[in-house]
Amino acid sequence: MAKPKKKKFEVTEQQTIDAVLQQMKEEGYLPVRRMEEPIFMEKKENGSIQIVPCGKKIVFEGKLI
């Protein structure tokens, strides 16, 4: 089976960005886009619900070389 032309690689908490870029290179993909998405958490304060940012998710999109 052939590799897909595009593939997404997510940076986990245990990985560094360099490790993900190296993994992409080893699998034969070239990074074409970096997406950062905020992660929110609901927090109750004084009877009201506040939405506060608690982190971010980094995803690289790779194109097959």
UniProtKB/Swiss-Prot annotation:
Give the superkingdom in one word.
Bacteria
Q: Which Pfam families match?
A: NETI (PF14044)
Name of protein:
Uncharacterized protein YebG
Q: Which organism is it from?
A: Bacillus subtilis (strain 168)
User: What's the gene?
Assistant: yebG
